[in-house]
Regions:
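Structural motif
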Residues: 92-97, 138-144
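Beta-propeller fold detector
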Residues: 45-62, 106-114, 144
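C-terminal motif of bacterial Sec signal peptides marking the signal peptidase cleavage site
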Residues: 18-21
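Repeated scaffold domains used in trafficking and secretory/extracellular systems
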Residues: 28, 68-78, 115-127
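Bacterial signal peptide processing site
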Residues: 23-25
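Short coil/turn segments that connect the beta-strands within blades of beta-propeller domains
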Residues: 82-84, 127-128
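Short loop/turn segments that connect beta-strands within beta-propeller blades
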Residues: 99-103, 144-148
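Conserved beta-strand positions in repeat-built beta-propeller and related beta-rich domains
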Residues: 87-91, 132-136
């Protein structure tokens, strides 16, 4: 009588371990997170921007403080293939690169572009990099999450 109980117990344990081993092992590789075109977003009264097309909402107050400005009319946002967000605005000296974490954006890189401020920045998706163009000056920069290429 004890023998079948032990066998049943061993089988149950084996099934539990087998099920646990097969659990969250599904991995999808070579994911391309890139946005084909930039988003141009206007902050609300609370300095929040919301991109409904790509389902992201965040507060830009800390970026404005870092740039030493109180407000902007709009920000430029684009995401590259590895999933990093690039943020800038007219009057900014820098492009901010953020990594998406659970419920937050963490600053990965602050890329200094100019001391005079960007006049009319625009982002373009270029496959291997993000192109930043200042439409007022014609200056162009190739960026990735580590800086200027």
């Amino acid at each position: 009588m004890a023998k079948p109980t032990y066998i049943a117990l061993i089988l149950c344990v084996a099934v539990m371990f087998g099920t646990a081993a097969c659990g969250p092992s599904l991995v999808i590789q070579d994911v391309d997170y890139s946005q084909p075109i930039e988003s141009v977003l206007s902050p609300d009264a609370n300095q929040e921007v919301h991109d409904q097309r790509f389902s992201i909402k965040f507060n830009i107050s800390s970026i404005l403080r870092e740039e030493g400005v109180n407000s902007v009319e709009e920000i430029r946002l684009i995401r590259n293939a590895p999933g990093f967000y690039f943020v800038t605005a007219s009057g900014f000296n820098n492009v901010y690169v953020f990594k998406a974490d659970e419920g937050e954006l963490s600053l990965k890189e602050k890329i200094n572009i100019t001391r005079d401020g960007l006049s009319e920045p625009a982002f373009n998706q270029r496959g291997s990099h993000i192109e930043l163009v200042d439409l007022a000056t014609g200056q162009s920069y190739n960026l990735d999450q580590t800086g200027i290429q």
